[in-house]
Amino acid sequence: MQLFQNILVSIALLTQIVFAIEITENKVDRGTVTLNLSDITIYPGASWSIIDNAYTSFVGKLDVRDGAGLYISSTSHLLALQVSLTALLHSITNNGVVSFDSRISRTSSSYDLRGVSFTNNGEMYFAASGEFSSPTALTSASWTNTGLLSFYQNQRTSGTVSLGMPLGSITNTGQVCLNNQVYEQTTQIKGSGCFTANGDSTIYISNVLLAVSPKQNFYLTDKGSSMIVQAVSTTQTFNVYGFGEGNKIGLTIPLMGNLWNSAYAYDTTSGILTLRNLLLEQKFNIGTGYDPSKFQVVTDSGSGIPSTILGSVAYYGRVPERTLPKSCQIPCKPIPEAPGTTPTQYTTTITKTNTAGNTVTESGVVNVSTDKGGSWFTTTSMFPALSTAPSTATVFSSDTIMSTVEPDTTELASLTDIPIETSSVEELLSVMSNWEISSAPTLSIETPVSSHHSSMQHSSFESSADINTVFSSESAFETASDYIVSTPSSISHSTMVPQSSVSALSVVSESLASAEPSFVVPSESFIFSASSAAPQPSSSTYSVSFTTQFETPSSAGPSLVTSVESNTELISSATQSSDIQTEFTSTWTTTNSDGSVVTESGIISQSGTSLTTLTTFQPATSLVVPPYSVIETEFTSTWTTTNSDSSVATESGVVSQSDTLLTTVTTFPPAPSAIVPEFTSPWKINTSIESSETLTVSASSYETVGESLAAATSSYLSSATVVVAPSESEINTSSSILNNEEIASAPVSDTTSIAEHHDGSLSMTTTEFVNSNSLPSSHSIVTATITSCNKSKCSESVVTYVSSVSCATITVGDSEKNISTVGNNVSSIVGDDVSNTQAITMATSTEGATTLTSVSGAKPSVANDATNSVHTTDYTTATTGVQNGSSLSIPSDIPIEISVITPTNSSSSAITIPYENGSNKESIENIKYLALVVFGLMMFM
């Protein structure tokens, strides 16, 4: 008995050795493939793709190494895959990629892999269309998954996925992805892996008596996914992630509460959801953060599972945030594309020996595609075979006339010997049919097309023969691995005409022996044409010319002609060619004289072993710009300029460029700079009157108070606006005081200059001349806020004036009492252009106070009449009264733009207070004192 077992084991081992299949490089098989009793091993870096093999049965073990791949796929709508491994004594081990893909088929597919063990450490994909039930079973006794298992259907059917031997156990520490599939548990589940339900998928725990590890995880990713657990007395707790958005968790029987508990309960503290039917219950750890009001009892009626009415619970709300286990974070990848499932084209090369004993290399293009029914077919187009036998040259001992041409980018090896032995056309034509060319042409990749024209003319008194030989060279490289690219070498083209009545044409390549090509592109074709009259055996004159023409437009090679004549007889040998002519397109590359590589294509004519370039296509994409073409562009630029004062300024704008000519189109205005250079700017002060109303200030009555006169005044005012424009740098004014038509003070003339500083501020320098004495002073132009109050209402206005103090505020109040000004006399100011003295009037009126606005630069015309009235055509500026004969009081500040009194029709008594902000002539204390006086007078009256 032991001997018999040893014999069986030996036979089995020998069988495995004999029939083992080892894949060490990429391989594609289409159609029926017989695996026999073979162990299959696919090594790293290699793949085996089996396409449209309806039944694939693995009899031996299957071992896919790391970095290797096994692909079994269907490309036919009518052909579904049936893949099985039925040898119970063999194993399946995958460390690479295994893919079974039958998604395109409209019939039922089946995947049934059995064996003594199943181990997946890589990626395995099982895909079906799902139009019919397509079961998948991986039912090995020893079952382990640490990688990715993906079960995919285009749509869900009643087919299920079974893992492991029923009633056995599986160990899952990886990821099991379900897409429109149903996983039915029939074993114990060990490990800390993950089952992920995508799309319309269901995880069905059909036998709770077989324990599921508490570390195993179940992930519901879509609203259509669900989980169903058998309801038995044995209660387990399942880790569920992604519960929400309407997906379901349920039991195999309807949910029903009892006297103590409801049909379902959620513990917000522990995150446990309990589903029960009377006394049977199962628990699900869904996590915390759920709203108990959003749970609802529903029915899960998916295919492939027991349809239980009101046996599940759905949560109609967002899934609370919860960290996924690492195994659930392994992505569910899409089904990979199998090599060779799309139409393809490749080249092939065959080397053989012909009947003459010469080595012949054939090359062709293989097209693999499918017909309308999805069936694969292959077409092969072979190029003609060329001999690689070395060529020999004929050496003439007689005197010869030599002409040599050495092109730079052409490498052509051919040998043609034409001995001249006859002078008749008939003999010439008969000899032409026996021409042989012993050559091994080698074409450099640098020159795709070169043609050589050789003409021989036979002429006599009444007979003539024209023989034209044209042979061209072209390359049609499909892939670099199929062709040998020779290096350039020196080529000598020799035309030899011996004096001993023998003429020969030979083209010799010095690098032919060293090239040793394994494949030579068909490169020569000969076209002969002959015409003759009646032949006569008289002596003839032959003209032999050799022409090298470079037909590629990008080639810079010359066109050289070498011609010799001799009174000799012609004997020639010609090549034999096939009568079958074909045309096809091809692509080649050339190298120009400047080293650039150009790709060209065209139509090639093939007659036997002869190839001729008929047409060269124009480049599909080429842009040739003339070297001196003028292109006009516009762009933004920045530049620096040097002013006449040697200062450098930076400017920017739009520049137009035409060839090398630059033209400034637009100059942008300079941006405001943080640093403004200090300079003196001219200003012009204009005065415009907004009202045509005449301003009058009159002295209506007088009374003696001691030695003084008291005057009551009435004011009729109109507003004015000052416009300041940079036109004059100096403002000249003059003024004097008249009393009873006599000058009360010396004439005063002013010269005022305004300057703008780098910080944006303005300043004014004033020089006053009193009796030819200059009194210069410098002031700053500042802004003050004037607050005007009328009864209980107040308003503010901003005025600009000249002062040595940066800012000041004065408040004008109102009163119901009239005031009188006491003085020796009412003095006034006259002047041509008075702008150096101004006052702010504090008025009292029973109807309201005056309002301050902005004005400056008045030109009053003042005169005293018999009633001592003061008249003006513009408006009157009142100042502090001075005694007769006293000098003009010169204010310290020269207002440029200060308050103006808005016209009012009421009669009022006013006291004028010169408003000189920062002046040492009138202090704030004096203003307060006068305000108290005014208040006292108001109380007195």
Curated annotation (Swiss-Prot):
Removed propeptide positions: 918-941
Keywords, alphabetical: Cell wall, Glycoprotein, GPI-anchor, Lipoprotein, Membrane, Secreted, Signal, Virulence
Lipidation (GPI-anchor amidated asparagine): 917
Single GO cellular component term: side of membrane
Subcellular localization: Secreted, Cell wall; Membrane
Superkingdom of origin: Eukaryota
Protein name: Cell wall protein IFF9
Naturally occurring in which organism (per UniProt): Candida albicans (strain SC5314 / ATCC MYA-2876) (Yeast)
Taxonomic lineage from the root: Eukaryota, Fungi, Dikarya, Ascomycota, Saccharomycotina
